[in-house]
């Protein structure tokens, strides 16, 4: 199965089809949503969307790695990463799709 990449534009168009709002208005809502989630994660907060998943930021500990080019050992400082944990409902929907169960009617 070939992977298809969907962009912000696809999301905006799909939402326009779902609701009776202009493309410009929906684009502003999508941008605002991304800004709100980003700001919350920057403050170390967790964002939970029921039946979709949880966004959170975590601190990854400092570690030691190896340069692929030179083989030299390098230290990797601790840093924040964004983690998304899908809900059971989302996992189940994707699992069904990937195994060919969806649309098999």
Curated annotation (Swiss-Prot):
<dbReference type="GO" id="GO:0030261">
    <property type="term" value="P:chromosome condensation"/>
</dbReference>
<dbReference type="GO" id="GO:0030527">
    <property type="term" value="F:structural constituent of chromatin"/>
</dbReference>
<dbReference type="GO" id="GO:0003677">
    <property type="term" value="F:DNA binding"/>
</dbReference>
<keyword id="KW-0238">DNA-binding</keyword>
<protein>
    <recommendedName>
        <fullName>DNA-binding protein HU</fullName>
    </recommendedName>
</protein>
<dbReference type="GO" id="GO:0005829">
    <property type="term" value="C:cytosol"/>
</dbReference>
<keyword id="KW-0226">DNA condensation</keyword>
<dbReference type="InterPro" id="IPR000119">
    <property type="entry name" value="Hist_DNA-bd"/>
</dbReference>
<comment type="similarity">
    <text>Belongs to the bacterial histone-like protein family.</text>
</comment>
<dbReference type="Pfam" id="PF00216">
    <property type="entry name" value="Bac_DNA_binding"/>
</dbReference>
<comment type="function">
    <text>Histone-like DNA-binding protein which is capable of wrapping DNA to stabilize it, and thus to prevent its denaturation under extreme environmental conditions.</text>
</comment>
<dbReference type="InterPro" id="IPR010992">
    <property type="entry name" value="IHF-like_DNA-bd_dom_sf"/>
</dbReference>
């Amino acid at each position: 199965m070939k992977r298809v990449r969907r962009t912000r534009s696809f999301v905006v168009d799909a939402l326009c089809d779902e609701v009776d709002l202009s493309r410009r208005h929906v684009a502003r809502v999508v941008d605002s949503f991304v800004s709100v989630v980003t700001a919350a994660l920057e403050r170390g907060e967790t964002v939970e969307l029921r039946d979709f998943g949880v966004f959170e930021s975590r601190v990854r500990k400092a570690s030691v790695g190896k340069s692929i080019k030179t083989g030299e050992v390098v230290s990797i400082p601790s840093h924040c990463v964004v983690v998304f944990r899908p809900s059971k409902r989302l996992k189940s929907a994707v699992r069904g799709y990937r195994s060919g169960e969806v649309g098999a009617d």
